[in-house]
A protein has these predicted regions:
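Sec-dependent signal peptide hydrophobic core
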Residues: 5-8
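A residue-level detector for the "anchor" residue at the start of short, highly conserved motifs
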Residues: 2-3, 14-305
């Protein structure tokens, strides 16, 4: 009987220990989780307020033929608008909507090339009119504008306007960000903010703080800013808060910080953006005093200390 009693007591202690040890929520180190793949070329095309057309990498087809403008999708994840008539009247509008975990390349009817980043939207005429070329941007895009002195090119982004003749530049104007930024790689643009005009030369970056209304023009590494369109992350002395916003758009995850101080830590590094999320976070954690853990689609960033 004494042995039976001891066994019963031990069983009770074991189950009590199990109950105390049961976790309420389990966060798994990123290196141990199922890999989260990077983004890829994909978008939605809406023409003349019609039905949305899904665009995916690997498909090659004619999407539409509207009043002499042929719309072609190629297999590499791009779309081009071919103006076969060369007419001067503007015909309808199209929008290319790129979701999180996406990117897309578009050639407009005048030959202008546009790389559209994730979580962004570009609206433009199917064919430009005779006086101006005007597009609207939400989010981020890199432009290589076909030169035409007769038709200035404008990018409308929120309350700002970029005026171009023929040049290569990047515009970042995400609605949820606190700033709008224009970075000029080559050529010349003017950045119009309300009643002020800022003229940029290559290598300059104009940043509008949308909260204070202040605009700052500075020299910077524009090549690093536009590296995203060449398939690379290039983080130059970037805060973890800003860095994780970029990662969240590309990988479709949410980042949360265990400590406000962690947001201010800075990171520099460059890598391909087509690696899995765990690879990218592992590279960051090796050179920064932070760890990453994931539950479902939420990544928690914590200090190692």
């Amino acid at each position: 009987m004494r042995i039976v009693a001891i066994i019963i007591v031990l069983i009770g202690v074991f189950f009590a220990w199990q109950i105390r040890q049961a976790p309420t929520e389990k966060f798994i180190p990123v290196a141990e989780v199922v890999k989260i793949e990077s983004g890829s070329p994909k978008a939605i095309l809406v023409m003349n307020a019609g039905e949305p057309i899904e665009l995916k990498e690997g498909e090659s087809r004619q999407v539409a033929d509207v009043f002499g403008v042929k719309v072609i999708q190629d297999s590499t994840g791009g779309l081009r608008f071919e103006d076969r008539e060369g007419a001067e009247e503007e015909i309808g509008k199209s929008s290319v909507i790129v979701p999180e975990k996406g990117e897309y390349f578009v050639i407009l009817s005048d030959g202008t090339k546009v790389w559209i980043n994730s979580d962004s939207e570009l609206e433009f005429p199917n064919r430009f009119g005779e006086d101006i070329r005007e597009v609207k941007l939400k989010g981020e895009a890199y432009f290589e504008v076909t030169s035409d002195s007769r038709k200035p090119f404008y990018v409308l982004a929120g309350e700002t306007k970029v005026h171009v003749l023929g040049t290569a530049f990047n515009v970042s104007a995400y609605r949820e960000d606190r700033q709008t930024e224009v970075a000029l790689l080559r050529g010349k643009v003017s950045f119009d903010v309300k009643d002020k005009v800022y003229v940029l030369v290559p290598g300059e970056i104009a940043t509008l703080n949308r909260e204070s209304g202040e605009t700052i023009v500075r020299k910077g590494d524009v090549a690093a800013i536009v590296d995203w369109k060449a398939g690379r992350f290039n983080f130059e002395d970037m805060s973890l808060e800003e860095l994780t916003v970029k990662l969240s758009r590309w990988y479709g995850v949410t980042f949360v910080f265990s400590d406000e101080a962690v947001k201010k830590l800075r990171f520099s590094g460059a890598m391909t953006k087509y690696r899995t999320l765990d690879y990218v976070l592992d590279m960051i954690s090796k050179t920064t005093d932070v760890t990453f853990s994931l539950k479902e689609n939420r990544v928690t960033v914590s200090s190692k200390k």
